[in-house]
Amino acid sequence: MKALLIAAGVAALSSTAMAAKLDEKVPYPKADAGFTRQVIHLPKQDAEDAFKVEIIAGKTLEADCNQQRLGGELEEHTLEGWGYSYYRLDKVSGPMSTMMACPGQKKEQRFIPVVGEGFLLRYNSKLPIVVYAPKDVEVRYRIWSASEKVEKAVSE
């Protein structure tokens, strides 16, 4: 009897975990051909309004000593009937680069970020951040937090 209760408990927990993961993605459309759907699940924070999420999309490319960037815009879309936001990075241009001489330096594989508008998002641990990006683009992220110290401007 005890073994049966343990087995039933394990089965219930595993099906709940699977259902929770699937339910979070159900309303979001599948990725179009040539795109991937990349998902970020944020941990709950106290005072989430003091946090932001920076989306850092990019590609790993061979690069020299110059500063390199890709161009693009992360566009917010709303899931009809649900009101959930998702984000789409349609076009990635570049790379753009500074033009310094790099004598004697070998090129190496580096992560080159996409810069543009829309990459700083509100922190909300209740919903996943869903990003559709071209297949050759990797999505990374960074959490920003505000200092509790607030400074006062000086009249001049």
UniProtKB/Swiss-Prot annotation:
InterPro entries: Ecotin_C, Ecotin_sf, Prot_inh_ecotin, Prot_inh_ecotin_gammaproteobac. GO terms for molecular function: serine-type endopeptidase inhibitor activity. Residues 1-19 form the signal peptide. Keywords: Disulfide bond, Periplasm, Protease inhibitor, Serine protease inhibitor, Signal. CDD domains: Ecotin. Homodimer. This is Ecotin. It comes from Pseudomonas aeruginosa (strain LESB58).
